């Protein structure tokens, strides 16, 4: 398997709980490397643009409101099979269905406040990384 890059957001609920380091440590212990990272307060326009694919869905307004409710950490992770590995580490979207020991099982409160986001495909990863990072901000390790 080739080295991949994936995109991660540590969401406002997890940032508020002060577990940024614990979540990042899980990525690193699993073999992923952080190659870009920013602590950022999303604007409404940024959140709407990032989640535009969900704009027609009933939860869109609540999702945007949640994502601008506090700072987030946006990261680019790199490693073997990074996309699938990150999704495995995150666990199911609904923390009640997430396997024990996953990030969402340990840190998420609900399906809405579910601690983290991760790219679900190579195309999504490329799009999401470029939404928040210029190529010069991503540094191979």
From Swiss-Prot:
Cellular localization per UniProt: Cytoplasm
UniProt KW ATP-binding keyword: yes
Binding site for ATP: 11, 59, 87, 93, 104, 114
GO BP, one annotated term: UTP biosynthetic process
Catalytic residues of the enzyme: 117 (pros-phosphohistidine intermediate)
Names of the cofactor(s): Mg(2+)
Keyword Cell membrane annotated: no
Main location: cytoplasm
EC number: 2.7.4.6
GO cellular component: cytoplasm
Molecular function in Gene Ontology: ATP binding; metal ion binding; nucleoside diphosphate kinase activity
Alphabetically ordered keywords of this record: ATP-binding, Cytoplasm, Kinase, Magnesium, Metal-binding, Nucleotide metabolism, Nucleotide-binding, Phosphoprotein, Transferase
InterPro entries per the UniProt record, alphabetical: NDK-like_dom (IPR034907), NDK-like_dom_sf (IPR036850), Nucleoside_diP_kinase (IPR001564), Nucleoside_diP_kinase_AS (IPR023005)
Family matches, as Gene3D superfamilies: Nucleoside diphosphate kinase-like domain (3.30.70.141)
Signal peptide annotation: none
Catalysed reactions, semicolon-separated: a 2'-deoxyribonucleoside 5'-diphosphate + ATP = a 2'-deoxyribonucleoside 5'-triphosphate + ADP; a ribonucleoside 5'-diphosphate + ATP = a ribonucleoside 5'-triphosphate + ADP
HAMAP family per the UniProt record, alphabetical: NDP_kinase
Quaternary context: Homotetramer.
Function of the protein: Major role in the synthesis of nucleoside triphosphates other than ATP. The ATP gamma phosphate is transferred to the NDP beta phosphate via a ping-pong mechanism, using a phosphorylated active-site intermediate.
Family: Belongs to the NDK family.
The protein's name in its UniProt record: Nucleoside diphosphate kinase
Taxonomy of the source species: Bacteria, Pseudomonadati, Pseudomonadota, Gammaproteobacteria, Pseudomonadales
